[in-house]
Amino acid sequence: MNMLDVRSLYVTYLSEEERVEAVRGIDFSAEEGKVTGIVGESGSGKSTAMLAVMGLLDHKAAVEAEKVSLFGNTVRAGDNAAIIFQDPLKCLNPTVKIGRQIAETVRNRKKCTWREAKKRSEELLDSVGIRH
């Protein structure tokens, strides 16, 4: 059984000036207990594809997929899954306060206002005893 199954994944970045298709209809799967790698040229969409599956792309990216399933269950991007970045410096930006980084993620995932995202970020930090 595949742990992760992704079918017909498309990612398009939208702006007022242009529309850029970063990922065009890719399929991939990861089998439980196996190491899976996605390889390709620089700029071919490897990181964009994984960030799309995890729900970590910003609000300017349109993500569509025929299927994203985790252990056979259809999931919304980012639910019940995590990603470990190869470069640990990409996990958190040391030049940006943690509250802002959390708020940006909340805003992108929940499609809410900046004020709502900031409030949620503060609630999350309070819940684990981190001063903001």
Predicted feature locations:
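Short, conserved post-Walker A segment of ABC-type ATPase nucleotide-binding domains
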Residues: 36, 47-60
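ABC ATPase nucleotide-binding domain
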Residues: 5, 27-29, 69
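Q-loop/switch helix immediately C-terminal to the Walker
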Residues: 87, 94-108, 120
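A short, flexible loop at the N-terminus of ABC-type nucleotide-binding domains that lies
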Residues: 3, 12-25, 56-62, 95, ...
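The feature captures the beta-strand-to-loop junction immediately N-terminal to the Walker
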Residues: 39-41
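ABC nucleotide-binding domain signature
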Residues: 37, 79-86, 100
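Conserved ABC transporter NBD signature motif
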Residues: 63-77
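Conserved ABC ATPase "signature" region
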Residues: 116-132
